[in-house]
UniProtKB/Swiss-Prot annotation:
The lineage of its organism: Eukaryota, Metazoa, Chordata, Craniata, Vertebrata. This is Aly/REF export factor 2. Residues 1-14 have a biased composition (Basic and acidic residues). Residues 16-37 are annotated as: Sufficient for RNA-binding, interaction with NXF1-NXT1. Pfam families: FoP_duplication, RRM_1. Residues 1-55, 151-218 are annotated as: Disordered. It comes from Mus musculus. Changing residue 29 to E: Abolishes interaction with NXF1.
Length: 218
């Protein structure tokens, strides 16, 4: 059997789908166009991450006095223009190779029919940018995927505040929550927040380089 790294995106999905259907009998299969990819080492299967603590826990000592930068907690991609036959397993399999996923699922209406969109949550923003750059505009089941980066999920660090009655520093809780999201509800198509703009390849490269540079210096 050929190495999966040399197979196309749709061929890998069809291979795994056939393995899952051993006891179901051979039904009709969808013909997927070949998608050329570079060789990649596939990571561990998708797993549910451990929940993050809701409350901030005090540390014994904090030597930093600025604390202006936020702590990145992940990034979300909105994938649209999907064929209605694409499943949750397909989305998880496509995007898991770029990094650890918090969630990857197709959106369905109340009757259980696919809306042709999917939400993909990555633990790392850099992984989301790589996936967006790799798959944006790539056909899946004959329909080019439209991928948008949703506002980053940032957890602001708590800043130490100067006490007026004491000579030392005391830690105070930041008032901000998850930043970057607009006040509008979730919409589809042109009704989404106007701040969600599609990024060009150059902008994606610039964001990815800036992220890697920041991680190298931290």
């Amino acid at each position: 059997m050929a190495d999966k790294m040399d197979m196309s995106l749709d061929d890998i999905i069809k291979l795994n789908r056939n393995q899952r259907r051993v006891n179901r009998g051979g039904g009709p299969r969808r013909n997927r166009p070949a998608i050329a990819r570079g060789g990649r080492n596939r990571p561990a299967p998708y797993s549910r991450p451990k929940p993050l603590p809701d409350k901030w826990q005090h540390d014994l000592f904090d030597s930093g006095c600025g604390g202006g930068e936020g702590v990145e907690t992940g990034a979300k991609l909105l994938v649209s223009n999907l064929d209605f036959g694409v499943s949750d397993a397909d989305i998880q399999e496509l995007f898991a190779e770029f990094g650890t996923l918090k969630k990857a699922a197709v959106d369905y209406d109340r009757s259980g029919r696919s809306l042709g969109t999917a939400d993909v949550h990555f633990e790392r923003r850099a992984d989301a940018l790589k996936a967006m750059k790799q798959y944006k505009g790539v056909p899946l089941d004959g329909r080019p995927m439209d991928i948008q980066l949703v506002a980053s999920q940032i957890d602001p660090q708590r800043r130490p505040a100067q006490s007026g009655n004491r000579g030392g520093m005391t830690r105070s809780r930041g008032s901000g929550g998850f930043g970057g999201r607009g006040s509008q509800g979730r919409g589809r198509g042109t009704g989404r927040n106007s701040k969600q703009q599609q990024l060009s390849a150059e902008e994606l490269d610039a964001q990815l380089d800036a992220y890697n540079a920041r991680m190298d210096t931290s």
